[in-house]
Amino acid sequence: MKDLLNLLKNQGQVEEFDAIRIGLASPEMIRSWSFGEVKKPETINYRTFKPERDGLFCAKIFGPVKDYECLCGKYKRLKHRGVICEKCGVEVALAKVRRERMAHIELASPVAHIWFLKSLPSRIGLLMDMTLRDIERVLYFESYVVIDPGMTTLEKGQLLNDEQYFEALEEFGDDFDARMGAEAVRELLHAIDLEHEIGRLREEIPQTNSETKIKKLSKRLKLMEAFQGSGNLPEWMVLTVLPVLPPDLRPLVPLDGGRFATSDLNDLYRRVINRNNRLKRLLDLSAPDIIVRNEKRMLQEAVDALLDNGRRGRAITGSNKRPLKSLADMIKGKQGRFRQNLLGKRVDYSGRSVITVGPTLRLHQCGLPKKMALELFKPFIFGKLEMRGLATTIKAAKKMVERELPEVWDVLAEVIREHPVLLNRAPTLHRLGIQAFEPVLIEGKAIQLHPLVCAAYNADFDGDQMAVHVPLTLEAQLEARALMMSTNNILSPANGEPIIVPSQDVVLGLYYMTREAINAKGEGRVFADLQEVDRVFRAGEAALHAKVKVRIHETVNDRDGGSVKNTRIVDTTVGRALLFQVVPAGLSYDVVNQPMKKKAISKLINQCYRVVGLKETVIFADQLMYTGFAYSTISGVSIGVNDFVIPDEKARIIDAATEEVKEIESQYASGLVTQGEKYNKVIDLWSKANDEVSKAMMSNLSKERVIDRHGVEVDQESFNSMYMMADSGARGSAAQIRQLAGMRGLMAKPDGSIIETPITANFREGLSVLQYFISTHGARKGLADTALKTANSGYLTRRLVDVAQDLVVTEVDCGTEHGLLMTPHIEGGDVVEPLGERVLGRVIARDVFKPGTEEIIVPAGTLVDEKWVEFIELNSIDEVIVRSPISCETRYGICAKCYGRDLARGHQVNIGEAVGVIAAQSIGEPGTQLTMRTFHIGGAASRTSAADSVQVKNGGTVRLHNLKHVERVDGHLVAVSRSGELAIADDFGRERERYKLPYGAVISVKEGDKVDAGSIVAKWDPHTHPIVTEMKGTVTYVGMEEGITIKRQTDELTGMTNIEVLDAKDRPAAGKDIRPAVKMVGLDGKDLLLPGTDVPAQYFLPANALVGVADGAQIAIGDVIARIPQETSKTRDITGGLPRVADLFEARRPKEASILAEVSGTIAFGKETKGKRRLVITPNDGSDPYEELIPKWRHLNVFEGEQVNRGEVISDGPSDPHDILRLLGVSALAKYIVNEIQDVYRLQGVKINDKHIETILRQMLRKVEIAESGDSSFIKGDQMELTHVLVENERLGADDKFVSKFTRVLLGITKASLSTESFISAASFQETTRVLTEAAVTGKRDYLRGLKENVVVGRLIPAGTGLAYHSERKRRREMDKPTRVSASEVEAALTEALNSSGN
């Protein structure tokens, strides 16, 4: 028997599984799970509190209430294990079997499962090809349905009401079978022949022409194939047996006072059992049909409520009027099983307390209160005490600890040594929200935190609390030390910059220390070395800010790992020389020879990390902190009312502004300007005045007059406390100082519009009642916004994590040659992000050549580090193709080469890194810093006049990019394409700026010309759209009849006459269909052809076009024939901040999106239909023309006869990402989305690496739509996983069959999360019911590839150290295959053992 137990014990480890399958349960399967039938609705006896027999808590079915004790108490020991008591029928076993044993209820009449009925699209409806309304009428006993028409005229599946049924009975007698209720539905489902139906549908689909019908049929076909493939039978969607949940999962808990708290499920089960028993009785009595029917309907409703309360009709409510929680409610939502218990668990060995500053700690330490440590490390202390022989038993050790004897503290100190603990601060927005530290025991009750890690935790000391967790196992301690230690997390995973940077006091101290003052004590002295400076300063012979000369010895490391020693004399200050003492060897003196503001310090730490490595940097960071604290204390910087110096010019500026406003008011009163103009002008005026005041104030604050050594008065940078705080970046900003010492400025109303009268006072002067009242709006809005923002930002992060959670680095190189083309990011002519920054940490996809030669300077496959970046900049390369997560060809996961550098470590990413989650956290974490509001253009916000020329900022060489142009007689070029760009390159060939050139721009320079800074190189009229000729010839008017299609008008000011084309709706009847045009003819009177085509050169004129040339006039190349006035585009609200990011990631189609050309070809306009214009594009390759109807109000940028390329903008508007993907491909989409998202973050000063956005994009592009199915089993129009399709195509290609063709599809992150391969991950995200219903019907398998699924089933995640565990597990299983015991062998062993034990 012992062997048998061992055998079972070994088989009990269910960890060894690779997939989880979900399906429909057949009645037989439900019975096989069951340990008995629940026949009575009773729960427990009210006197004895023992479970009733055959009731919902029956001990005979579910097992004993107490461990190893039957209900009547006859058997009470472990030795009786497995015995079944003959008196009460209870098996003697552990009480916890009541958590796992299920029961069942035999239903007297079948019941449809509400999930498959009502969860849209209704699965039962699809299979039976009936509408949901009809099926409900049958199920809830309103109509009969014909099951077998026999030889009658009725049809199968036809609905009959009572009257029709009785008529049919009279007419046909028993020749047909029609029933109602779930049994009828079950019969119909049972009768479906899947094979036959699938064959019929596969034939029918290709013969159908209507799109909607094809959609409907292919939906049905998919469902049928799913049923056929999964082995589920359709009739299982109707229940005949109902499983009952184990009682301990729906407990009945006694409260004090003799009352009971019960789970709602018990009420719901009771209802079902009561109705079921009543129905059985009625059937036995053969009661009248109408009563039985009513009871059956009530049973159906009771089961519906149990499975998913409230899905149909009104929810059943309990005694307190709230709806009961059904089985479906148990698993869905934030409080459901998935999110509450499976994904977020509570942890033992943890504690929490308030945090305070630990300025004396080292970076890897934290202060842990003794009381907490004693409690957290209890088991370790017990063990140590016993080992030492200080306590004989655990009990004795416990007593010692409770008494807090002196030995206990010694043991505690020993236990804690080198045992890291994890500190976590909620909300944990990114992985740096949990880090490991070595505990240092402290008195008191607050945890001490190292100041430098505050930035990572986003912590401050105003009452924040943090949690401590103890890693127990050796492996956990190892991971905590090697991966999570605060000293290993110097760089931020979001952008690779240091996150351990000093802030506030430390910055102020270092800044104060490195400032210089004129005529300070000891100015002009020369020192032999740093030690001498130190001695003189300590002796008080030289002031901290004195300008001195010092001889220094420095060791400078170069990039190749070598180092150079040199000695030189530098001009510096005493403070900087003192600071250089803590700088590690290898860095040059120049890094500290400047006022150390926040940015400079950050740069210093970054440089230190790259040059001398991690260990030195950590020591250096600590030294910086200690130094900073020391000197900020010495500086005595504080703040007093006299620091707010109000500028003298303030009154004058405000008076002048008030005068101007009065002037505008009087103009408005006399009707010269409109209300809107007045409002805008006034607001402009005040914002200008405000800027002037703050300028005057800052120049006042930032300078002070002092007398130098020679007795001359000079200006030096001010030592005003407030100015120093703002200037160093320690606290405050110019905007805040402006409110304290300048003027508060314009305020916004609650609706976001700006109030015309500004607050002219500042806080030092004090606000009047009205001014205070106006300013309360803003303050209140700020708080409300913050609360909303936090919730929204959290939800965005959750969606991002969900879509990217299964993306892990799984291999080193996928071997792809594709990538993204990287160019410098240029905005409005300025280079916002140079190429070097964008390619840093990426792998080059294709060889980079020296410009103008064939010489390879960066070979493909190079990981670009700082050294290579300098090299690329030096050689003035302006475009590089780099590997990207989007183009990676790894099947499951991503490869290390396509991802590139692990930003937080600075080397190539390791296999097993969960890059998806890191990307999601990096994008989501700064979400709370983004603004919520949408910016209105108008008022003082961002108002720019339309650009009408290009004025270069830097001198250099002109480069023209894909610009089609013609040359005018005077040598100027005229742009005749829309996408042309003009760039200026410096002497090294590096691009410094780039501008877009609109159609019709006159360019006064040529490719390769040298220009000076500030010169204007191109001009155009922003308010009209010209039509430019591309050849010379004679103008001939076509269809231009005065009064019918055109009208002449004379300009009063200039006396010039213009011809204006009339709008079609203003023309008389004769002119409705005439299309006025200007035609070009040669000297011989023949039509000229457009260059390179056989299309006659005639320019059709749209409505309102102004023609500037006379009939028969000679014109030259590049002349303007006509101008189309452009209304200034409507000012759209620019959605900014968080909503914009969410829109982009959700891939929402914008309202009134821009219209792009679907094909490359020539534009023509067809016949107009009501309110719409017909645009026809004739492709150049001679394929069929493409037609599109465009609303008349859309302003088009193109005219007849013009050439467009696929994807070019025809009508302006916000871009639709789906169009970009369809017409321009994946890389154009990537460029668009990355730039758009970066723009939002850049506005807030947040840096995020592009690759994180690309990583999320990869997940959004997982799906494809089948365009042609070829020989595959796919159906046209299906959405499939890209990897599936590629695998299938490879298989077909190998067999020389036709492969399927597909187009890429962009899904929003929510949709992408729900359509993932893993149903566990999707169900735990959103729409749990729908996901599970779909998965069950199709019998889906979840291969547990992602992180989330593995957390839910309770295994290590397949990332990081868990990846190694999983691959090792698989390897071991391959080796151990033969030794595994099959189920049949276990059964044989069991019977044998039982037989032998029986004898």
From Swiss-Prot:
Residues noted as binding Zn(2+) 1 in the record, renumbered to the chain: C70, C72, C85, C88
Pfam families per the UniProt record, alphabetical: RNA_pol_Rpb1_1, RNA_pol_Rpb1_2, RNA_pol_Rpb1_3, RNA_pol_Rpb1_4, RNA_pol_Rpb1_5
Record's keyword terms, sorted: DNA-directed RNA polymerase, Magnesium, Metal-binding, Nucleotidyltransferase, Transcription, Transferase, Zinc
UniProt: Zn(2+) 2 binding residues: C814, C888, C895, C898
SUPFAM superfamilies linked to this entry: beta and beta-prime subunits of DNA dependent RNA-polymerase (SSF64484)
Entry annotated with the keyword Lyase: no
Domain of life: Bacteria
Gene3D superfamilies hit by this protein: 1.10.132.30, 1.10.150.390, 1.10.1790.20, 1.10.40.90, 2.40.40.20, 2.40.50.100, RNA polymerase II, clamp domain (4.10.860.120), RNA polymerase Rpb1, domain 3 (1.10.274.100)
Reactions performed catalytically: RNA(n) + a ribonucleoside 5'-triphosphate = RNA(n+1) + diphosphate
MF term (GO), any: magnesium ion binding
A GO BP entry: DNA-templated transcription
EC main group: transferase
GO terms for cellular component: DNA-directed RNA polymerase complex
The record's free-text note on cofactor binding: Binds 1 Mg(2+) ion per subunit.
Keyword Metal-binding (UniProt): yes
HAMAP family referenced in this protein's UniProt entry, alphabetically: RNApol_bact_RpoC
Family listed: Belongs to the RNA polymerase beta' chain family.
Subunit comment: The RNAP catalytic core consists of 2 alpha, 1 beta, 1 beta' and 1 omega subunit. When a sigma factor is associated with the core the holoenzyme is formed, which can initiate transcription.
Known function: DNA-dependent RNA polymerase catalyzes the transcription of DNA into RNA using the four ribonucleoside triphosphates as substrates.
Protein name: DNA-directed RNA polymerase subunit beta'
The organism of origin for this protein: Pseudomonas syringae pv. tomato (strain ATCC BAA-871 / DC3000)
Taxon lineage: Bacteria, Pseudomonadati, Pseudomonadota, Gammaproteobacteria, Pseudomonadales
